[in-house]
Amino acid sequence: MEQQVKDDIQRVFQLQKKQQKALRASTAEQRREKLQRFLDSVIAHEEEIIEAIRKDVRKPYHEVKKAEIEGTKKAIRDNMNNLEQWMAPKEVGSSLSPDANGILMYEPKGVTLILGPWNYPFMLTMAPLAASLAAGNSAIVKLSDFTMNTSNIAAKVIRDAFDEKEVAIFEGEVEVATELLDQPFDHIFFTGSTNVGKIVMTAAAKHLASVTLELGGKSPTIIDSEYDLMDAAKKIAVGKFVNAGQTCIAPDYLFIKKDVQDKFAGILQTVVNAGFMEDDHTPDRSKFTQIVNDRDKPLALYVFSKNQDLIDNVLQHTTSGNAAINDVVVHFSDVNLPFGGVNTSGIGSYHGVYGFKEFSHEKGVFIQASK
């Protein structure tokens, strides 16, 4: 890596560090204006973004449009529309005295680093950026070196919208990421593999920086004997094959009764061969919960069932970052729910208010009544 790049990284980091006092005092209106610039830039470069992603990973146009473009715009708008509510101090009362009160205040963490993956290279980098900006931070961004066309257009989007003291982007290979990780960031947000996540966490530990790690894992799917096998097959096929199978929460392995597994396999094959999705008892509960629990904790777990006792049993006796009932993958898009893993599948969560809180320091303030 050229010395000039190292110098630029250190220069921009220090430039953003000097901005923290002003950012801490930023109003909802100022943050919304910044997010509006971001949204306008994404819209202005929409077709270029789509073309770049298609060059990098060969995604179909409609998949890029829906997941990468609309997903990013939705994330930005959600932050814009809820800023006042999220930023407002929250009264929680006091356990010490009826004359006292407690409030929660949300402060920006400071200078944040966002490292994106290659499978959804634009949205999974820009959605966290929107949350960081909503929380009042500055950010330095780096996309995956496997998606250089997308990185190039992302740089254009960011530089058209922001001064580098607000948001900066660096391009390049692993040496650039390594140099970035040497800087004393206040928070690091990483999406990628568990192995690289460990490297990121090790680097963060040197500066006691907080982290959000959006990792992966093998997501189990349980199909109850009473559930419509055709419906399950359609949803599983979509969830597994969308994005050429490269989705961190795609269903990975199934639990189904042996006497219906061949029938289900035939239905699933028919659905897949059709191009998109066309068509008695479940395994012993203790067996599939044991198998799930013997593995690393997954990022997602799925249950197809109308039996509430079965659903409750699975949810109570397994651990996963998230879970969905009678569907797969779609929970990622629900901003009312936190999205994140647990242990090897991740640390921390985001989306909606949860992303705002992830990029904020939640400060408790005790207030004693004056005499």
Would you name each region that the model predicts?
Residues 1-103:
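N-terminal Rossmann-like NAD(P)+-binding subdomain of aldehyde/semialdehyde dehydrogenases
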Residues 162, 195-287, 325:
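ALDH superfamily catalytic-core signature
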Residues 273, 282-371:
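Conserved C-terminal structural/oligomerization subdomain of aldehyde/semialdehyde dehydrogenase
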Residues 92-231:
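Rossmann-like NAD(P) dinucleotide-binding subdomain of oxidoreductase/dehydrogenase enzymes
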Residues 31, 76, 136, 167, ...:
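Residue-level signal for inorganic ion chemistry
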Residues 18-24, 114, 222-223, 253-256, ...:
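Short, well-ordered beta-strand elements within core beta-sheets of diverse protein domains
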Residues 20, 24, 39-42, 46, ...:
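Structural signal for hydrophobic packing residues in well-ordered secondary-structure cores
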